[in-house]
């Protein structure tokens, strides 16, 4: 007689000695364990190579589009910028500065291919021309001053919001309808509807203006030496970044909470979860090892897709708190009509989004083997 075995994840397994067929009379595909390891590894390698190729092409297209934007503008953008700099400063740019502007915005005496090669040369040398509003400061210098603050703010708050929202959503979906779920769900729904700038203004008014617990603007105390290995400087950064960070986390975690909760409500009724409970596993083992593990995958995918929205929220929050990141720099560039700075900031934000999506795609492929086999 054939022996029937049971699995906590899949219910009743196929009899070991019985030949099984599907509805069409064909033998089904062998399970993953029956596929030789070298074939599974080859499929995984192809998946990662395809994803790397996709994001390389995406980056190439984004850079090419950024190259074409000023070429579609009427007239000669480089000459217009040169005239504007002369009007603002009272002195014309130096020949080297004019050459830098020409490399980035085009030289009519060159063909498009020559301009494109010069553009790539400028990018590889991190040469984006000079800022119009802060002439003669190079755009790259301003980017390098603002980019670390934005990466610190966006990176820390995105991860923190994702972790908080995912864990709370898993707990609420594990026992839907309990007291915690009934009270917390309406509150988070209301919080999720708040615009980022409105919440930032409320937080600023309460904690910085009325209570005076935290600073109203800036990224660190100017009286503390700018040294990363200085404990007082680190504490100053945490103090000045607390209000922007709390605002972004409060805005961001609600989406992850509802996403995880909705998937968990469905997952807890799956057969493999019910069987795990029937086998006597503890609630924590079933929650973490079976239900939450499978419900987590949509949140991993959504993490990359949310980067664009997080950047948009960060721009508003940085502006409200005068936090010296890319958002505040973009607002200042728009106000001053500083096109070289605007164009470079948009390129950097696009690149950050692409990198975040790439990392999330790689993590998703490691968590779910089915994506590597598709």
Task: Give the positions of each predicted feature.
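Alpha-helical transmembrane segments of integral membrane proteins
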Residues: 42-46, 143, 147-180, 196, ...
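An internal, D/E-rich "acidic patch" concept
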Residues: 3-5, 30, 36-44, 105-166
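Transmembrane alpha-helical segments of polytopic membrane transport and secretion proteins
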Residues: 1-55, 176-177, 362-374
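Hydrophobic alpha-helical segments of integral membrane proteins
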Residues: 44, 52, 97, 101, ...
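Membrane-water interface segments at the C-terminal ends of transmembrane alpha-helices
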Residues: 65-72, 118-121, 187-218, 247-249, ...
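Helix-terminus/capping and membrane-interface signal
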Residues: 35-40, 59-66, 71, 149, ...
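Hydrophobic alpha-helical transmembrane segments of multi-pass integral membrane proteins
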Residues: 57-65, 112, 116, 125, ...
């Amino acid at each position: 007689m054939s022996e029937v075995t049971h699995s906590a994840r899949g219910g009743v397994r196929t009899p070991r000695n019985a030949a099984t067929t599907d509805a069409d009379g064909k033998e089904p595909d062998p399970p993953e364990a029956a596929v030789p390891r070298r074939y599974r590894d080859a499929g995984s390698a192809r998946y990662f190579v395809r994803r790397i190729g996709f994001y390389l092409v995406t980056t190439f297209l984004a850079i090419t589009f950024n190259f074409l934007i000023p070429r579609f503008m009427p007239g000669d953008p480089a000459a217009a910028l040169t005239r504007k700099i002369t009007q603002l400063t009272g002195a014309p740019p130096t020949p080297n500065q004019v050459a830098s502007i020409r490399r980035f915005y085009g030289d009519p005496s060159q063909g498009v291919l020559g301009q494109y090669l010069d553009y790539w040369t400028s990018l590889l040398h991190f040469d984006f021309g000079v800022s119009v509003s802060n002439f003669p400061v190079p755009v790259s210098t301003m980017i390098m001053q603002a980019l670390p603050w934005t990466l610190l703010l966006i990176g820390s708050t995105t991860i923190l919001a994702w972790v908080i929202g995912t864990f709370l959503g898993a707990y609420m979906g594990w026992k839907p309808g309990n007291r915690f779920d009934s009270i917390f769900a309406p509150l988070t729904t209301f919080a999720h509807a708040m615009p980022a700038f409105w919440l930032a203004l409320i937080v600023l008014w309460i904690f910085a203006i009325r209570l005076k617990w935290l600073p109203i603007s800036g990224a660190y105390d100017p009286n503390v030496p700018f040294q990363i290995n200085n404990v007082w400087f680190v504490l100053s950064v945490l103090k000045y970044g607390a209000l922007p960070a709390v605002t972004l986390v409060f805005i961001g975690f609600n989406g992850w909470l509802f996403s995880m909760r909705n998937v968990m409500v469905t997952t807890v009724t799956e057969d493999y979860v019910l069987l795990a409970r029937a086998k006597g596993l503890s609630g924590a083992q079933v929650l973490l090892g079976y239900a939450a593990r499978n419900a987590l995958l949509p949140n991993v995918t959504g993490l990359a897709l949310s980067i664009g929205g997080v950047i948009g929220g960060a721009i508003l929050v940085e502006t409200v708190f005068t936090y010296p990141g890319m958002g505040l720099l973009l607002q200042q560039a728009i106000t001053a009509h500083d096109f070289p700075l605007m164009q470079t900031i948009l390129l950097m934000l696009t690149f950050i989004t692409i990198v975040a999506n790439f990392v999330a795609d790689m993590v998703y492929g490691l968590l779910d083997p089915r994506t590597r086999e598709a």
